[in-house]
A protein has these predicted regions:
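Helix-loop junctions that connect tandem helical modules in alpha-solenoid scaffolds
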Residues: 2, 51-58, 91-100, 132-142
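Flexible helix-coil junctions and inter-repeat linker/turn elements that act as hinges
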Residues: 37-42, 58-62, 73-83, 94-101, ...
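Hydrophobic core segments within long, regular secondary-structure runs in both alpha-
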Residues: 49, 70, 82-93, 108-111, ...
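Long, low-complexity, highly charged intrinsically disordered regions
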Residues: 1-68, 72-86
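Amphipathic alpha-helical elements of HEAT/ARM-like alpha-solenoid repeat scaffolds that form extended
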Residues: 27-35, 61-74, 102-114, 127, ...
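Extended alpha-helical scaffolding segments
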Residues: 122-176
Length: 176
C-alpha cells in the first residue's frame, strides 16, 4: 500500500511539474512560480530539469523564459540550477559528438540564455566557444556543426561576454 501511495504521489508530482512547465510563457511566469515552488522540488528535481530541457527544445523561442525560470529557482535551490546545467552540458556534448546540428544549436542557445541569466558563469561560455573552435587538438579545422553552434551561441550571449570578459572574447580564434 505504501509503495502504491509513493507511486501515485510521484505521478502527481510529475504531472504537476510537466503541467506548470508546459504553461510557462512571458505573461504568466510570475503567477506560475508560486505553484511550482508549492511542489516538492527537492524530490522532483530531476523531473523539473528534464521537463525544462524538453520544453526548451520543443519551443526554442521560449529559451529566455525558461532560463529566467531556472534563474529564479536557482536563487532558492542552487543545487537544482547546477543539476540542470550539468544535464544541458552532457546532452550538448552528446549532440556535438553525433554532429546533430539542430540539437546542439538549441542546447547552445539555452546555455547562452543560462549565462545571460547568471545561472552559469561567463567563463563556461568562453570555454565552450574555444572547445567548439579548437576541435580537440588535431590539426583539422572545426566541423561545420561546431562553427554553426558557436555562431548561434555567440549571437545569443556575445553581448554579455563582451561586457564582462572582453579579453576572453578576443582569444576566440578567427576561422577563415
Amino acid at each position: 500500500i505504501a509503495e502504491n501511495n509513493q507511486r501515485a504521489s510521484w505521478e502527481d508530482l510529475r504531472r504537476g511539474v510537466n503541467g506548470i512547465v508546459n504553461k510557462v510563457n512571458v505573461d504568466n511566469l510570475a503567477a506560475l512560480l508560486p505553484e511550482l515552488f508549492a511542489l516538492n522540488l527537492i524530490r522532483g528535481r530531476g523531473l523539473l530539469c528534464q521537463s525544462i530541457v524538453r520544453a526548451q527544445m520543443a519551443a526554442p523561442d521560449l529559451g529566455p523564459i525558461f532560463a529566467a525560470t531556472v534563474a529564479i529557482i536557482n536563487t532558492k535551490l542552487p543545487a537544482l540550477g547546477l543539476l540542470l546545467l550539468g544535464r544541458v552540458l552532457k546532452r550538448l556534448r552528446r549532440a556535438l559528438k553525433r554532429s546533430d546540428t539542430k540539437t546542439s544549436s538549441g542546447l547552445a542557445q539555452f546555455l547562452a540564455h543560462l549565462i545571460n541569466q547568471k545561472v552559469a558563469h561567463e567563463i563556461l561560455g568562453l570555454q565552450f566557444i574555444l572547445l567548439l573552435l579548437n576541435d580537440q587538438g588535431d590539426s583539422l579545422p572545426p566541423s561545420d556543426t561546431n562553427i554553426e553552434t558557436a555562431a548561434s551561441f555567440l549571437t545569443a550571449c556575445g553581448h554579455l561576454l563582451l561586457q564582462v570578459a572582453p579579453q576572453g572574447v578576443h582569444l576566440v580564434p578567427v576561422i577563415g
